[in-house]
Amino acid sequence: MAIRTFRPYTPGTRTRVVTDFSEVTGRKPERSLVVSKHRRKGRNNRGVITCRHRGGGHKRQYRLVDFRRNKHGVTAKVAAIHYDPHRNARLALLFYADGEKRYILAPAGISIGQTVVSGTEVPIEIGNAMPLSAIPLGSSVHCVELYAGRGGQMVRTAGASAQVMAKEGDYVALKLPSTEVRLVRRECFATLGEVGNAEIRNTSLGKAGRRRWLGRRPQVRGSVMNPCDHPHGGGEGRAPIGRSGPVTPWGKPALGLKTRKRNKPSNKFVLRKRRKTSKRSRGGRDS
């Protein structure tokens, strides 16, 4: 996979940077693994907006992805690499020896014709799924289960990977992409390797229209709203917000407020909290 840039023959192509889709081999998705999905548009069952700036965009069909990898001991051959409109990662289409077809997240470095398998005693190769207890220390993994049998819930985005740090008793210590070190049960499954399409972080949409194609609507500043719409709104002209610091549309502090519960039961599994992001790395001024 490579990054493609464009000459500035229009304002929209001046800063446009996209992936060239060279790793995608399948033109159409597998029909048996595609279902229709109702587009929520950021609304709940009563039609109330619960997630702002969502709606519109190109039509999509949901690909059924196998996050459980529960066909233990049955080898599968990678038949194609497909595009998924619902995620940045690519999908690998697997043809199992018993005739079943499934999608999995395509790991970096996987190739057409490669054989993958899941189980408790499988080779240490990219794309194979196995319990964390069977994975060597220092290995990179993705699609990690939080609870055995529930399917991969962590480390699923493009270019992400977690590192196996230590094993002690019934738990395995994982260093997550956020730099947090967390304990996970040793019987939980994970897939070897990192998720492919890591170059997606270097892309740029280039224009507002491409963002609308993805189903993202414009974000309006609170200071230009009315007082009934945002705490920052109102006033004559470009008025200050009138508060000691910026707040959310619901009046809560917007910068630096911790949202995790202090007494959350899973806190005991977090050995080291994630590293805080500095102002310089966020793009702000360094005091």
From Swiss-Prot:
Highest taxon above the source species: Bacteria
UniProt-listed HAMAP family: Ribosomal_uL2_B
Protein family according to the UniProt entry: Belongs to the universal ribosomal protein uL2 family.
Region of interest called Disordered, as start-end residue ranges on this chain: 221-287
NCBIfam families according to UniProt: rplB_bact
Record note on quaternary structure: Part of the 50S ribosomal subunit. Forms a bridge to the 30S subunit in the 70S ribosome.
InterPro entries: NA-bd_OB-fold (IPR012340), Rib_uL2_dom2 (IPR014722), Ribosomal_uL2 (IPR002171), Ribosomal_uL2_bac/org-type (IPR005880), Ribosomal_uL2_C (IPR022669), Ribosomal_uL2_CS (IPR022671), Ribosomal_uL2_dom3 (IPR014726), Ribosomal_uL2_RNA-bd_dom (IPR022666)
Function recorded in the entry: One of the primary rRNA binding proteins. Required for association of the 30S and 50S subunits to form the 70S ribosome, for tRNA binding and peptide bond formation. It has been suggested to have peptidyltransferase activity; this is somewhat controversial. Makes several contacts with the 16S rRNA in the 70S ribosome.
Gene3D superfamilies named among the record's database cross-references: 2.30.30.30, Nucleic acid-binding proteins (2.40.50.140), Ribosomal protein L2, domain 3 (4.10.950.10)
Protein name: Large ribosomal subunit protein uL2
Gene Ontology CC entries for this record: large ribosomal subunit
GO biological process, any: translation
Keywords: Ribonucleoprotein, Ribosomal protein, RNA-binding, rRNA-binding
Organism expressing this protein natively: Synechococcus sp. (strain CC9311)
GO MF term (any one): transferase activity
Biased composition annotated in UniProt, kind: Basic residues: 258-287
The keyword rRNA-binding appears for this protein: yes
Lineage: Bacteria, Bacillati, Cyanobacteriota, Cyanophyceae, Synechococcales
